[in-house]
Amino acid sequence: MTEKIAILIDSCSDAPQYLQDKDYVKTVSMQIHWDGKVLRDRVDISPDQFYRKIKHGASIPTTSSPQSGDILEKFQELEKEGYRDVIAICISSGLSTTYNQISLLASQQSNLNIKVIDTKNIGIGSGLFAVYADDLIKKSFPFQKLCN
């Protein structure tokens, strides 16, 4: 029997769109703080909109990790969809608190077996971890082997 494995990524892990569109892949949005507003990356503002604003002289924003409620919501969605095993792929813990935050929240989930990966990368470097995990899932790798 094939295991039902999900992938959770943060929005700074630039995984290809085809991967983000899969039912078993969930994305938690980083927060962008810009001119007094808090925007969810790839929800409230697209990468194209972001770069257009920068090009037209907008102030430089700051970012923060996803809200705990958003992460918990994704965990709940996965559980309701019948997933028990989740591989959470995060950008570098040296650049963001996202890894620590997801690790803490994952440890509180009694109905999900969650392996949190610190890619020690950002952007496409982190996104490639998600591509690789997806490839191993398609090849029916068991969850424990996938996590190693």
Question: Language-model features: where?
Answer:
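Surface-exposed, flexible loop/turn segments at secondary-structure boundaries
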Residues: 33-35, 94, 122
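Short beta-strand segments
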Residues: 8-9, 88-92, 117-118
